[in-house]
């Protein structure tokens, strides 16, 4: 699994620098006070659903949070999910380790502006890698 970690303080008005690396077979120890970006192995399309991302309870009991604020997706989001991972204590993770689950809620009615059709959508580019914050695009 590919993971990223921010190397500088976060800047909302510019692209932030991250280090990208593969988790080795022996695992990787996540440390508190760092923000890690991970990515799901699964690609999803949510045309008629609103997806919610939740951590698995066994992972939460290790002190791992898999999302900071982006636990809800948009109808029309078609991509892998970037995970915003932080930990309460040092903990070793492994590639392919099940850490989260998606829950889908069916939409009744018409979707007027699906995410994959929005001109302002910043995270539409299909990828198998974590995607760093694009907050800076809000200030152009």
What do these predicted ranges mean?
Residues 2-14:
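Short, small-residue-biased leader/transition segments that mark boundaries at the very start
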Residues 1-2, 63:
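Glycine-centered flexibility motif
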Residues 15-140:
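DUTPase catalytic domain/fold
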């Amino acid at each position: 699994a590919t993971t990223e970690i921010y190397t500088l303080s976060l800047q909302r008005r510019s692209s932030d620098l991250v280090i990208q690396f593969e988790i080795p077979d022996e695992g990787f120890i996540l440390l508190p006070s760092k923000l890690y970006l991970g990515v799901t192995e699964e690609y999803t399309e949510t045309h008629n659903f609103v997806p919610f991302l939740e951590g698995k309870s066994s992972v939460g009991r290790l002190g791992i949070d898999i999302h900071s604020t982006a636990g809800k997706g948009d109808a029309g989001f078609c991509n892998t999910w970037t995970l915003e991972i932080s930990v309460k204590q040092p903990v070793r993770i492994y590639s392919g380790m099940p850490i989260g689950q998606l829950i889908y809620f069916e939409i009744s009615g018409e979707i007027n502006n699906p995410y994959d059709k929005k001109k302002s959508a910043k995270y539409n580019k299909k990828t198998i890698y974590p995607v760093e914050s694009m907050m800076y695009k809000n200030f152009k």
